[in-house]
């Protein structure tokens, strides 16, 4: 993509309304623009990141055996009355009346709708287990939306739901999603720590939040330091094998947010040199809710004994749009964003130091075509801005590689390659630079 033809409305100054780094940098980098309180338009650069994150989430869900569908944003209030949540949910729910005076709502979550879809299609234990997910926009009318996409009113979520005949089956589904989440976040360049979360009236141990460490996190977190760099299962993971060892390696070590923190237990279980106290951001949550919805909404299956029983359900959420902000909170510096490779909107920022110079233009065009032919996403700054502005802009948007081409380097047969994450610069031949970028 040529910058001269791209839509990238960057800002030179920090927006006054931005309180945290991710909000400030997303606005400055031209990723989003606010259209109303807590509601954002996603501009091309931001949308590119959003799609990369979606792709990773989708890939890992399918790898773990989940099946994708797409549910609408608008839901009938009747479904929520069946579950008993319509009147109880509160003012966060946006309630709508259509032209036929029917009560509708803009879905803040999808338990009722997925249960309705399931109960209309599945009647026998032979059709179990099932794990269904979708990636869809949601709306919650937060009283004080703030921090940009981190706590907005409209947001993109991955919602998944498992359906099993019994609790043991539900545990297997839960373990698969636990591992799937570890892999998803690791692929995004994040070190996500699973922490025991509230299970509500159901009880048990099947509720975990996935937290990434960031100075501006909304929660205080306390954990064993070894959890931060613990290895994540590789591509050869078999989800049909026993996943307990992978999970136990994490859940056996202390990890809690301030809501669940037990200071005495922390000191007793974790050596002082291994204690980590920090701030964290929740990016995912998985939990088992048993028959809470299947019982009240009549999602029943006939078991092997011929008797009807309500299915056991689990819920698995990832904040897709929130992850964009969370990644920036975890990976930025004074100059701007530092994107992990897997979620970067472009892999390379190609900088022409002297647009209009025939030799420099030709060299840039040649490299641009070669990178593009290899399937590498390139943002080519072919504008006539001064060099300093081009460098600042590329640092701000945080692409993993910066490839700089100018008349002086071309005379000696070299280009400059900069790694954004480390700031390391190298003078290389064009061929060597291309090889390094290609990996």
UniProtKB/Swiss-Prot annotation:
Descriptive protein name: Proline--tRNA ligase
Pfam families noted in UniProt: HGTP_anticodon, tRNA-synt_2b
Gene Ontology biological process: prolyl-tRNA aminoacylation
Biological role stated in the UniProt entry: Catalyzes the attachment of proline to tRNA(Pro) in a two-step reaction: proline is first activated by ATP to form Pro-AMP and then transferred to the acceptor end of tRNA(Pro).
InterPro entries reported in the protein's UniProt record: aa-tRNA-synt_IIb (IPR002314), aa-tRNA-synth_II (IPR006195), aa-tRNA-synth_II/BPL/LPL (IPR045864), Anticodon-bd (IPR004154), Anticodon-bd_dom_sf (IPR036621), Pro-tRNA-ligase_IIa (IPR002316), Pro-tRNA-synth_IIa_bac-type (IPR004500), Pro-tRNA_synthetase (IPR050062)
Subunit note: Homodimer.
Main location: cytoplasm
CC terms in the record's Gene Ontology section: cytosol
EC number(s) given by UniProt: 6.1.1.15
Homology family: Belongs to the class-II aminoacyl-tRNA synthetase family. ProS type 2 subfamily.
CDD domains assigned to the protein according to its UniProt record, in alphabetical order: ProRS_anticodon_short, ProRS_core_prok
SUPFAM superfamilies: Class II aaRS ABD-related, Class II aaRS and biotin synthetases
PANTHER family cross-referenced by the UniProt entry: MITOCHONDRIAL RIBOSOME PROTEIN L39/PROLYL-TRNA LIGASE FAMILY MEMBER, PROLINE--TRNA LIGASE
Catalyzed reactions per annotation: tRNA(Pro) + L-proline + ATP = L-prolyl-tRNA(Pro) + AMP + diphosphate
Swiss-Prot/TrEMBL keywords: Aminoacyl-tRNA synthetase, ATP-binding, Cytoplasm, Ligase, Nucleotide-binding, Protein biosynthesis
